[in-house]
């Protein structure tokens, strides 16, 4: 017996990366998972090196970032890798979620896989938000103030939670220090969740574009899919390098190069681009508590999909109505992202409210209605 099968630890690697049977029909959308793993490794590695030189004292935070950029050997490179790595992490994550929505990867028997994936998404957003606050530029300070203030909308306990998080009466030194501690801890929790995600995936294996269970026609992970993954890894590294070396601040905000000043409010307060769709949903609801519920509900509503999608057939590859509504939903999500960075004024307010209504209607009304209608058509077709 080869050592990769007989050794206790290597046998785990073997069962996941070498002999793992994969459907022969999976396409390049299934490669995004490996890119997410690469992004997580890049973020943890670059983050550890940045933490060696970063100071979480509010008086020194901004200057310590500038010290990394100017005085530390290759500090500018590590900082830009970490900053752009966060953006690319979310690009890959949104692609991964989009693939799952299109191909029905959330349906039974992969519900646990989907639930863990949504938890990973939530933890990643929390980690990214706290990391953005650590730079302590203008947008960091005011972003931290606005987002943490949202918790004051929670009935009865909200007014007490906000000072508890701040460690005072405003965003101050204790806030940045606890954000730094949590920002350092959460990626390792993310890594543990990713291991759980892989374990859940290993139980039933990957789905496929056809939406059928193809246990007969499978290929080993190595060499076929390992080399296929390497193709997208090299393409990813090429595009990532173009941003890091030639356009490192494109995905950032210029106001964050101004030191945080609680006495000067920026013309518009916007979070990083990957949080904008949910920020637009928050702003589209006039009531503060309603907006907070809508924003968190917009993320957690992903958990309802395994139950609201009643279709017999997994995925949208052969379903015209579902495919059309999915691409309409995709356009709507991109529209929300654009509205999140615009000023709160007419006509963007009304447009944001319509887009928010469609976002929730897709999960709660459109998916159940269309899946039920397609089931009837499927039943009529098979009877004939």
Swiss-Prot record:
Alphabetized InterPro entries for the sequence: Cyt_b/b6_C, Cyt_b/b6_C_sf, Cyt_b/b6_N, Cytb/b6-like_sf, Cytochrome_b, Cytochrome_b_C_euk/bac, Cytochrome_b_N_euk/bac, Di-haem_cyt_TM
Record-listed heme b b562 binding positions: 82, 183
List of residues binding a ubiquinone: 202
Major subcellular site: mitochondrion
Hydrolase as UniProt keyword: no
Record keywords, A-Z: Electron transport, Heme, Iron, Membrane, Metal-binding, Mitochondrion, Mitochondrion inner membrane, Respiratory chain, Transmembrane, Transmembrane helix, Transport, Ubiquinone
Any one of the GO CC terms: respiratory chain complex III
The record's free-text note on cofactor binding: Binds 2 heme b groups non-covalently.
Cofactor(s) recorded in Swiss-Prot or TrEMBL: heme b
Sample GO molecular function, one term: ubiquinol-cytochrome-c reductase activity
Signal peptide annotation: none
Ligand binding (heme b b566): 96, 197
Keyword Membrane belongs to the record: yes
Pfam families: Cytochrom_B_C, Cytochrome_B
UniProt subcellular location: Mitochondrion inner membrane
CDD domains found in the cross-reference section: cytochrome_b_C, Cytochrome_b_N
Matching PROSITE patterns: CYTB_CTER, CYTB_NTER
Highest rank taxon of the organism: Eukaryota
Membrane topology: Multi-pass membrane protein
Transmembrane segment boundaries: 32-52, 76-98, 113-133, 179-199, 225-245, 289-309, 321-341, 348-368
Miscellaneous note of the record: Heme 1 (or BL or b562) is low-potential and absorbs at about 562 nm, and heme 2 (or BH or b566) is high-potential and absorbs at about 566 nm.
Family classification: Belongs to the cytochrome b family.
Complex formation: Fungal cytochrome b-c1 complex contains 10 subunits; 3 respiratory subunits, 2 core proteins and 5 low-molecular weight proteins. Cytochrome b-c1 complex is a homodimer.
Role played: Component of the ubiquinol-cytochrome c reductase complex (complex III or cytochrome b-c1 complex) that is part of the mitochondrial respiratory chain. The b-c1 complex mediates electron transfer from ubiquinol to cytochrome c. Contributes to the generation of a proton gradient across the mitochondrial membrane that is then used for ATP synthesis.
Name this protein carries in UniProt: Cytochrome b
Gene designation per UniProt: COB
């Amino acid at each position: 017996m080869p050592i990769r099968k007989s050794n206790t630890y290597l046998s785990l690697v073997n069962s996941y990366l070498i002999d793992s049977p994969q459907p022969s029909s999976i396409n390049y959308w299934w490669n995004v998972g490996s890119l997410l793993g690469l992004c997580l490794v890049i973020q943890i590695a670059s983050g550890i090196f940045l933490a060696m030189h970063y100071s979480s004292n509010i008086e020194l935070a901004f200057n310590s970032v500038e010290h990394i950029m100017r005085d530390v050997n290759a500090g500018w490179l590590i900082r830009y890798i970490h900053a752009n790595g966060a953006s690319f992490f979310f690009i890959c994550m949104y692609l991964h979620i989009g693939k799952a929505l299109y191909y029905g990867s959330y349906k039974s028997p992969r519900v646990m896989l989907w639930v863990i994936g949504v938890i990973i998404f939530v933890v990643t957003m929390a980690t990214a938000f706290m990391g953005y606050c650590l730079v302590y530029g203008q947008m960091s300070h005011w972003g931290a103030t606005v987002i943490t203030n949202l918790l004051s909308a929670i009935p009865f306990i909200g007014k007490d939670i906000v000072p508890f998080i701040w460690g005072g009466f405003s965003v101050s030194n204790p806030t940045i220090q606890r954000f730094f501690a949590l920002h350092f801890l959460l990626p390792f929790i993310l890594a543990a969740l990713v291991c759980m995600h892989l374990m859940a995936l290993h139980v039933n294996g990957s789905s496929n574009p056809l939406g059928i269970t193809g246990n007969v026609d499978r290929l080993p992970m190595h060499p076929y899919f390992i080399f296929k993954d390497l193709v997208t890894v090299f393409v990813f590294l090429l595009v990532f390098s173009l941003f890091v070396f030639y356009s490192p601040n494109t995905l950032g905000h210029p106001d964050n190069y101004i030191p945080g000043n609680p006495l000067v409010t920026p013309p518009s307060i916007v979070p990083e681009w990957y949080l904008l769709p949910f920020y637009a949903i928050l702003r589209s609801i006039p009531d503060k508590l309603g907006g907070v519920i809508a924003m968190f509900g917009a993320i957690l509503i992903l958990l309802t999909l395994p139950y609201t999608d009643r279709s017999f057939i997994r995925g949208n590859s052969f379903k015209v109505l579902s495919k059309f509504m999915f691409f309409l939903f995709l356009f709507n999500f991109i529209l929300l992202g654009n509205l999140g960075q615009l000023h709160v004024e007419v006509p963007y307010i009304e447009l944001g409210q319509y887009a928010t209504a469609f976002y929730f209607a897709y999960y709660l009304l459109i998916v159940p209605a269309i899946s039920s209608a397609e089931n009837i058509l499927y039943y009529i077709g098979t009877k004939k």
